UniProtKB/Swiss-Prot annotation:
Single GO MF descriptor: lyase activity
Organism field: Burkholderia cenocepacia (strain HI2424)
Family to which this protein belongs: Belongs to the D-glutamate cyclase family.
Keyword Lyase applies: yes
Keywords carried by this UniProt record: Lyase
Protein name (Swiss-Prot/TrEMBL): Putative hydro-lyase Bcen2424_3550
Disulphide linkage map: none
Amino acid sequence: MTPSEFRQSVRRGAFRGPTAGHCGPFAQANLAILPDAYAHDFLRFCQANPKACPLLGVGEPGAFRIDALGDDLDIRTDVPSYNVYRDGRLTERVESLDALWRDDFVVFAIGCSFSFEDMLAREGIGLRHVEEGCNVPMYRTSIANRRAGIFGGQLVVSMRPLRGADAIRAVQITSRFPGVHGAPIHIGDPRALGIEDLNAPEFGDAVTIRDGELPVFWACGVTPQTALMDAKLPIAIAHTPGHMLMTDITNASLAVF
C-alpha cells in the first residue's frame, strides 16, 4: 500500500489503529496543531529540543496541507486518531478535525521513530511492539525540556527491548536519521531517566522484555504534547500517541550519511 492509499483508508475510516509497521519505506510524522498566536514560541521550542522535536514541516496559518509531506494530504482527516487539549487537559479523542478546524491553526509535523523501524527490520532487528501487535511503549521522563516562551514540559521517550548486539547495531543505524530522532538517548537502567516501572508506560502499551534484553530509549515526538499540556493553551491538538500521519517522504532521503 502506498502512503496515499494508506491516508485514503484512514480518511474513509477503514483504518484507526497504531501506524507502526505500515508503509515501511516511508516516513511518519507526529503532529502538533495550535493557534498562530503561540506558533513562534512553539517553533523556538522545537528548535531548542531537536532530538525530541525534529521538524519535517510547518504549515501556514489555516493551512491543512503541507505540500512537502504529500500531494493529496489533509491534516484534518488523515491521522487515525487525534488528541484534543483544552487548558492543558486532554478533553477528547476524535477521528476527524473537520468540526474543530480554525483559520488560525498552524500545523507542526515532527519526525517519528517509526520511520527508522523499517531500517532496523531490514537488518533483522526484531521490534517487540510490532511482533505483539500493539503500540510502542512511551514514558514521561524526569528530564526537563529546554524551555522556549510558555513551552516546557518533560522529555518523553519510546522504548524497544533489544539484545546487546542488536542495541549496538541500532545505535549505528539510527544515528544516520537525526530527522526522526536519531540515536537512542539511553540504554539500560530506566531509573536514570526517572522511569520506575517499564510495565506502566504513560502512553502506548507495555511489551514483553525477555531475559538478556536491554531497554533502549529514544527521544519521542510525544514530547511536544507534554509542552502543550504545560502551556495550558485554550486549545491545542496532536496525534494520539502511536497514530501517526503517513507522509510521502522516503526514509532513505532522511539519512545524513
